[in-house]
Amino acid sequence: SNSVLKLLLCIIEIDYSFWGGKLAGKLDYYRKYSKDLIATISISSANGTTSQKLNNAEMLNSGIELEVGSQLDIIGKDIQWYGNVNYAYNLNRIERLFVTDNSAKTYLRGDFKEGENASTIYAWHYAGVNKDGIPCVEEGSSPDGLRPMNTVYDNTSDATGWLRPQGVKVAPHIMGLTTGFKVYNFDLSLIVTGKFGHKFKRSSFNYPTMGKTGTSKIWVHKDVSKLLDGDKAMPPLLTDTEDSNQMYYDSYYTDAMDYLYHNANHIRFQELNLTWHIPEVWLQKIGFRTAAVYGQINNLGLITANKYKNDPEFPEGTVKPERSFIVGVKFNF
């Protein structure tokens, strides 16, 4: 073995073609083991800090990439159909990472964890109110397993198992489809993409500190109606008293609750294009070699898997791509 090798890579590729090329494509399998990746690891406090970003992590990446393409003559070369599908799947896992700090903050900020996917999401689970009427989350260091949400969570103990894994934020399954018809001098094409197997965090009521700080702002969100209706799936508002410590609500808990994470599967209709290629006999009279008139629509629509109909890639409060229309002419002399 090579002790200084930083990357172990295995790639298997299969190219195929059937029925005279009417169905063709390729299948790739890869398995990559990477060493000396940059990550935050634990070091001796004698260095003046207990953690440092160093080249000391190891990760396994494996997956497949599939391409399938076809072109069929329906009526000779005058009417044709074509299509191409691309699919990619990736699985990664942190194989080696030396850390001694597994406190709650490391899970909430997305630090790598040995044995887990690099993009695993962790969140608090709301456990209802305690006997004093204070909303609580599950936390292992408390005697009853509950942490009141108006107190700071234990950030010194090992928090393994406290926060629940919600899935991954990077889609492991990605698909793309390009298909179209050629009908005499007209071309009609469609581009569709899809991402599957991951989660996204939707926006919600932000539990502000009710104006007690200069930066406190209330987000006018429809979820506030659930609070007013007493929805037990969400933490209620704390009573506005001096000892309620409302600042802990939005600072430590309510922005990282498991009920905020939802299925991010979606299919996006990216582009529809119609092109008319002007007949050559017409072009010869005006001295053009080729010319075409086209119309295109971008961002046609979206199919989502979450009940809120949120766009997983452009959550509420961000700028979403608007549907656009393009008409143009292209030609060669």
Regions found by a protein language model. Give the residues of each.
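Extracellular/periplasmic, surface-exposed regions of secreted and cell-surface proteins
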Residues: S1-I121, A256-F333
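N-terminal hydrophobic signal/anchor transmembrane helix of membrane proteins
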Residues: K6, K22-K26, H173, G197, ...
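Short, hydrophobic/aromatic alpha-helical segments in well-folded domains
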Residues: E13, A159-W162, I174-L177
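Active-site-adjacent bridging/hinge elements
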Residues: I38-S42, G63, M149-S157, E242-S251, ...
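Conserved small-residue
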Residues: L54, Q71-K169, F200, T209, ...
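Long, contiguous hydrophobic alpha-helical segments, chiefly transmembrane helices and signal peptides
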Residues: N56, W124, V192-F196
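Glycine-rich, aromatic-lined ligand/substrate-binding cores of catalytic
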Residues: Q166-S203
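Extracytoplasmic gating/loop element in the C-terminal half of outer-membrane beta-barrel translocons
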Residues: K195-G287, A291
